[in-house]
Amino acid sequence: MSEEREENGISRATLNTQRLSAMIDSLNNEKDDRLFPSPTTTRTMITEEKADQSDVFKPPSRLLRSPAGDVSLPPGDNRSSMISNYSGIIQEGVEVSYVVKNRQQTQERRTSKDSNSLYSLKEPVSKNELPSLPMLPSEATLTKHLSDNQSTKSNTNADEIVIKPVTNAKPVGRFNSNTSKKVEGRGSLKLLSSPLRQEKVMRSSIGSGNLASESGSSTYNTKFHQSIQEQLEEEEEGNVSDKLSIVSSVIPELYTTTNEAPKAINPIRSETNDYNPTIPPRSKDRPRSRLFIEEGDGEGDLLTEEILPTPVQPGGHYKNSSQISTVSEQKSESYYSAATSMPPEEETYLTRPLPSTPNEDSRVTSNLKRDDTLKAIHDRANHTSTSTNKQDDDMYEDIIEETPKKTKLKKDTKKKLNKKKSVKELRSFDIDTLNQLLSVTKGTLIGSEFAQLGMKIEEKRALERLVDSLSRLTADMVLDPDRYEEGLKRLDKATKALEGF
């Protein structure tokens, strides 16, 4: 009974330990497994051959060039890469065939290799067991191949490669990576790949680096009598062809030729108009003229007679409205510059006749007065007989008061003389003068005063400036009696300056 109890206690203890271990394992995460790797069992049984192999092919203790810097590696049994699971050991070799000297020797080596196991290959190989290098072809065989190939020339300049089967070719057995490394380390086959060496020594299948395939060997045929200069020329020709192909691949420029000269396209619609610049408005400071337009029936007659030239005469005091006229204008509905009526021909400008001089009888030799201004008189024969009798009563005339002769003291006569002088000075400034100043621009065009003179633009502008300055001076003389004497002096200076040559 005691034994059964002990067995039951042991079984319960084992069950409890198993349950605890399962619970602990369930609590563990993958991160814990990575942080605390399980201890791996290492094999204690190592053969002497593996020990020798590890001594010969001992891996480096550290990785000098790695992403993590200098990292120590595990021993050779657990060797693994840091990035992948690749072990870095080649298990099989590539099967190649080579030319042997004697068939019997190869058969003996083959049988010996077949008899030995894979572990026998790991033993060091003696010099006698190494494969011997093939013999170079003789001159007789080379000349024979040359004579055969001269009949059939290749189209290209490249050398021909002729592959023929070899009877005594035997394949090489599969080697381990360790044994292959040992063989190559002791006696490696160095290829003659330098160009200077190839020019001096005749090429063969081994010298050119082309070993025989599994089905047979290969012989390398070349043009032996070709000189170095010809080879250089062929290389240059090849380079030229490459350059030409590169140049031809570039798209050339496209040139176009036009046989006809370019012509301008005619407009669909064209109009030609005279250039008429705008005329600035009349200045407010410009003085008004003494003439005004008569309202009523006289406007129709003025429009009919605007084309006729108007004679200019010096006039004195006028009593009738028929004697009052205005400057005739043309094209009153639209504004035109003074250059529109200018004749286009300049030759006639120099050969034109001189203007007529005024008569000496009509000149006023006395001092200048305010009423002695030039007036344009229109001859109206049809309208004078009907309009004179009706408008005599409506017109304003200067009233001249005659001073009666009185016998008084000298003091009274002096006072009367002073009054007469003041009345004479202000006598002509009446309502008629105000009407003339206010209605001077009615029906007139600015800039057309000198349109009928036939002058150039520069001369017309100079004349307009002169008339403008004179009209300002006379207007100031009329409006301000204090400036009358000064105005007379300036007019005298202006007439002296404009007398001529």
UniProtKB/Swiss-Prot annotation:
Residues 46-55 have a biased composition (Basic and acidic residues). The gene is NBA1. Residues 1-78, 102-133, 146-165, 267-286, 338-366 are annotated as: Disordered. Keywords: Cytoplasm, Phosphoprotein. Phosphorylated by CDC28. The modification Phosphoserine is found at S138, S208. Present with 6490 molecules/cell in log phase SD medium. One of its GO terms (cellular component) is cellular bud scar. Residues 275-501 are annotated as: Necessary for the normal cellular distribution and bud neck targeting. Interacts with NAP1 (via the central domain consisting of amino acids 143 to 362). Copurifies with ribosomes. The keyword Phosphoprotein applies. This is Protein NBA1. It comes from Saccharomyces cerevisiae (strain ATCC 204508 / S288c) (Baker's yeast). Residues 11-20, 148-158 have a biased composition (Polar residues). The modification Phosphothreonine is found at T403.
